[in-house]
Amino acid sequence: MLPPLRSLLAFIVLLLMVQSSATVSAQSKFEKSKTMGFAIGTGYYLGEMNPNGHFKGRFQPGFGGFMRFNLNRRFGIRAAVHRTNLLYHDSDSNDPWIANRNLHFRNAITEGSVVAEFNYSRYQIGNTKDRFTGYLFAGLSLYSHMPEAEIDGIWYALQPLGTEGQGTSSANAGNRYATTGFAVPFGFGFKLNLGHFSALNFEWGMRRTWTDHLDDVAGYYASLAVLEEEAGQLSELLSESRIEREGNLEDPVGQMRGYNGLDDRFAVMSVSFTFRIDKSPTTCWER
């Protein structure tokens, strides 16, 4: 599925702003600069096991690295690689239906991204007048993921098991979902100068994806008998673990397992240390 038109338009506008700023910067006293850094933090997701609760989950550590190309004191381009680790359990939910479903997953998402940044005020590492600024960012990323679930202390990759009947003859079963995809990262942050060569960044960003399978839960229960016969007992065990069954039915085939058609999203919260990798500014600063 292609991104919504308004998301694409917003991204194009940002790129045009960056391009125009490069022309302006060539006429000023500002020299372009390059910085790089590393980030640590955590993340959360919005999906079947956490439908609408921001900043909820069993937070796991994440990390990454990046390089930033500052076109002037307002605009920059950042290329980054980041690992976000998610861990969720239905049993943590206050929703009785979700808690009764009793599923869980973990997912290590590796993401490569390119984003455009806009500083709220003029900012540059090494400029004593540029102590602090807020900033916005948006761009495009490519990510890979593989949800897993645990039985008796062993974690199993879920996509090959087809827990909703993917790749089997069960009713309404489709193909196995992709484990790579594109996302639109967007968010905001704050930059704090530490001296001539370094800075701290604090950032929150959402990733709008086009997959409903970060958690391996999307549509309807497959036939447990078909899963066991065609995909194996492990697929059947990890597909269904409800505490109480609707209508006392042993096989829930066709019953709702997730929210079909609602894509998952994930967010990243991080603190990063940034340092300048070209020469320290020595010219007089613009006032």
Role assignments for model-derived ranges:
Residues F38-T42, G65-F69, V114-Y120, A138-L140, ...:
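Residues on the lipid-exposed face of transmembrane beta-strands in outer-membrane beta-barrel proteins
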Residues R74-I77, Q124, H196-L200, K279-T283:
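Repeated loop/turn-to-beta-strand initiation elements of outer-membrane beta-barrel proteins
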Residues F75, A80-P160:
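Gram-negative (and chloroplast) outer-membrane scaffold detector with strong preference
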